[in-house]
């Protein structure tokens, strides 16, 4: 009886152990059979190795890399392991490369470690903090701009303001030369445009941000800036032309008083020497003279334009003769004196004053004749008082008809179709188009 009872108990224990083994997964298998694989139980995934033992730590499979915690459970989401941060997808695979997680973008190296700070790839630089940043960021005390894809921007950046970012992504400040032009950037890096006073002078930066040089028309006024961009003031020589520039108004125009002396400027600001009864030259005035044809002298500035004009006139079939060019103060005085004496001799009863008035009606007072400038010349036609070709084309060479028809009330001189004055093409062409005489054009009428 006891033996029978013992056998029954042994069988019961064996059955119980089998039940427990099945429940806990303790099953004795053949050691040569692969028992590895995933099991889902107790709300998670677990992995058994070849021998059926549960795995912890890192797991490499052909599907990816996984991590199983101390509880044998497969990790998902964020996990810090040995001081490094990793992320595992819902299926447990470790993330590498770029990943979008909860609306943010992260980068993981090939070992799955989340990267922070600077990352460079495919020619672009990125900054992770720890997710990918974009827009303005202050890094190591310096501002940088990152595009929506996270790449750091260099070169020109146009937002509400315009910036230029150097090779390190840092906005330039102060004056900077870029692609052959100079720009000025404020302390916040924005590109400045408009007037600005710096330690070395006054500058103007155009709407595109580039520094103004040479002539610029700003708000209806003409200013001149040197090659270095500094605003020029005072007298300026630009080729054969002269200008007077002020700090606020740029090139002066019209009639101006400078150092108690009258000066006259065109609408473009070019100074023109005006000589008439109201604006006489001093006795000492002598221009730089050169020989024209062995008989006449002219101011050096008009020699080549005059030769070109006369040569082209001859080519066009025009015939001319030059009667007068430069005449000194003394020569003008002698001519007036001779004319005065001639009237007295012709009419002994003529009073001294009347003789002078008759002479002055025909001969300009010394200092008031344009011939003293060396810039004018009397050119007649062959047997006639004028050369039609010159009347039509003189403007193209920088000459004007000094005393045009219908302007005697302004110039004080009757129409003289032979009297030409050199002013340069920058003056002669717009003056021709204006229809004004010299006094009108210079604001002296």
Regions found by a protein language model. Give the residues of each.
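Extracellular adhesion/carbohydrate-binding repeat motifs centered on closely spaced tryptophans
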Residues: 2-271, 392
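Extracytoplasmic cell-surface/polysaccharide-interacting catalytic and binding patches
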Residues: 257-445
